[in-house]
């Protein structure tokens, strides 16, 4: 184990002996490493057979966390390892694609689409990634129009 990975595990209260297990705060290392954009740690954890189906307290998987971090290396490693690209969280029903589209992460959306993410899945409120991406663009235009009237 590389020293920087050992340090990361220890600094985040994970077991060096059992690095894929969650810490005392009920956080999985794969999700935290993905959220922090630590592709080196993500790859290490995947090599240690980290479970791909773990979720955080909101029901999001590691792919969602990597999309949040806007980190293509983490996203690619997780997809290559076989993470559920279309996982829908229990709270809203959103997928990583829906999240990425709703927050304007164009590069991430492209990466997820290239990997085969399902564009027809909907949130519990009946929104698709396209619906939320369109809403985001409209809000951007509204903001521009309001500012031009000042």
Please name every model-derived segment.
Residues 26, 59, 92-93, 126:
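Start-of-repeat signature of ankyrin repeats
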Residues 22-23, 56, 89-90, 123:
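Ankyrin repeat boundary/linker residues
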Residues 16-19, 52, 85, 119:
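Ankyrin-repeat inter-repeat connecting loop/turn
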């Amino acid at each position: 184990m590389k020293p920087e990975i050992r340090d990361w595990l220890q600094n985040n209260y994970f077991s060096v002996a059992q690095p894929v297990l969650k810490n005392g705060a009920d956080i999985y290392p794969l999700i935290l490493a993905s959220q922090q954009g630590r592709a080196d740690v993500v790859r290490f954890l995947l090599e240690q057979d980290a479970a791909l189906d773990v979720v955080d307290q909101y029901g999001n998987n590691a792919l969602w966390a990597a999309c949040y971090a806007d980190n293509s290396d983490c996203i690619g490693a997780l997809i290559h390892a076989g993470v559920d690209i279309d996982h829908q969280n229990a709270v809203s029903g959103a997928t990583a694609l829906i999240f990425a589209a709703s927050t304007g992460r164009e590069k991430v959306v492209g990466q997820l689409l290239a990997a085969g993410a399902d564009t027809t899945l909907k949130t519990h409120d009946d929104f698709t990634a396209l619906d939320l991406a369109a809403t985001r663009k409209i809000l951007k235009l509204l903001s521009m129009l309001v500012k031009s009237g000042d």
